[in-house]
Amino acid sequence: MNKKKKSIVIFTGPSGVGKGTVEQLVFNYDELNLSLSCSATTRSPRGGETNGIHYYFISKEEFKDRIKNKKFLEHSFHFDNYYGTLYSELDNIIARNKVPFLEIETNGAKIIAQKMQKLKNPPYNLITIFLSPPSITDIYKRIKNRGTENAQTIKNRVNKAKEELLEAGNFKYVVYNDRPERAAQEIREILHKELDID
């Protein structure tokens, strides 16, 4: 079977590291044939976010029902909300001969990697990429400049980011986001190698 068809890109890093910015640049490289996997969440949409594009915004009751029915590859609870990757989303992307690109929280990425390691014949080739910030100060500034969180939430996110940075070594690739364009180019090179793109 084609290696590219079975591959899944797991893109993670702390809140405020600039994943969204770098991701947009990576998606400009058409030859990578990526398709963003839309996660489900119970949090409220931020300005400009659309259901089914940025996230599937669902109730906590519906989310818990899907957990019970084993509809998630992974799910986690943080910042008072659930987040998860639906098997159906991955299946739909792979059926279109695209490579699923999951931008997910660090703990969710670890759960997927651990789950695949336990399997004798894992169904996916995982390409795990951790985006690292220049400094914690940069994380603080980015989150504050969003203008969507209060002071306590910002503090919580920065503290969580410090914890997540300790996990960077658990991922196959660590990309330093000193400049988004450079980080995106490095990810492009990683994916060319991993997906056997000439």
Swiss-Prot record:
Keywords: ATP-binding, Cytoplasm, Kinase, Nucleotide-binding, Transferase. Pfam families: Guanylate_kin. The keyword Glycoprotein does not apply. It is an enzyme of class 2 (transferase). Transmembrane segments: none annotated. GO terms for molecular function: ATP binding; guanylate kinase activity. ATP binds at residues 13-20. Residues 6-192 form the Guanylate kinase-like domain. Its main location: cytoplasm. Essential for recycling GMP and indirectly, cGMP. Belongs to the guanylate kinase family. This is Guanylate kinase.
